[in-house]
């Protein structure tokens, strides 16, 4: 494992960490929270809706006190009473960060805030794929942050060949279930990265829109940077 990442709030920038705790329902502390419009109940979708794109100018990371949300101008704990106001200034409308699975009273009634991503608990991406995309787009900044993986694997193997195979990751075991279909999040501008539609266009044209793989977790445990990843023999 070359790197591991966690994203405490869906649609916000995540954090590169040393270890991750994996469970059957995914990465502990990953995408536990959502960014939501307090009036309509709309969940943030920067890849589809332009008004949510400032989400990628915000960082979320786990501290000993809880989740810390920060911009270039401020930093607040997720339970800070002033956070909703700071987010409204950031986006230009009333919005907030709330826990996935909780309920929210909006102008259209009480709604349950469902998690955005249900495809698979863990997302893996190889350095090989990043390198190949960089070769196809020599003028682009092919940065891992555009693709939001949990695990970056240092391998020259083709990750598409992992689908359907059992995988051992440190103390954990899982099953690679499917290729990762890509959306507009890959091309959106974020801190130190410009908007670049060619990234998604090239993935669609050269990789059938897929970049990375998803895996289900069969046995829980903790993984760390530097752990070995292996697969069952076909």
What is the predicted function of each stretch?
Residues 1-234:
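Metal-cofactor-dependent catalytic cores
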């Amino acid at each position: 494992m070359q790197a591991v990442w966690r994203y405490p709030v869906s649609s916000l920038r995540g954090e590169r960490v040393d270890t991750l705790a994996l469970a059957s329902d995914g990465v502990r502390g990953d995408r536990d929270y959502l960014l939501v419009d307090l009036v309509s109940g709309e969940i943030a979708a920067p890849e589809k809706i332009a008004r949510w794109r400032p989400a990628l100018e915000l960082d979320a990371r786990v501290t000993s006190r809880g989740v810390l949300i920060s911009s270039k101008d401020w930093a607040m704990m997720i339970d800070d009473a002033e956070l909703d106001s700071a987010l409204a200034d950031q986006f230009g409308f009333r919005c907030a960060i709330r826990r996935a699975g909780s309920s929210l009273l909006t102008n259209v009634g009480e709604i349950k805030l469902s998690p955005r991503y249900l495809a698979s608990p863990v997302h893996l991406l190889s350095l090989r794929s990043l390198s190949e995309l960089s070769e196809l787009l020599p003028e682009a900044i092919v940065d891992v942050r555009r693709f939001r993986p949990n695990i970056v694997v240092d391998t020259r193997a083709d990750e598409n060949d992992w689908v359907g195979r059992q995988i051992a990751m440190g103390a954990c075991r899982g099953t690679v279930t499917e290729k990762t279909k890509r959306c507009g999040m890959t091309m959106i501008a974020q801190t130190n990265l410009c908007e670049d539609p060619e990234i998604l266009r090239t993935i669609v044209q050269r990789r059938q829109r897929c970049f990375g793989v998803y895996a289900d977790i069969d046995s829980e445990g903790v993984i760390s940077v530097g752990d070995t990843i292996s697969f069952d023999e076909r």
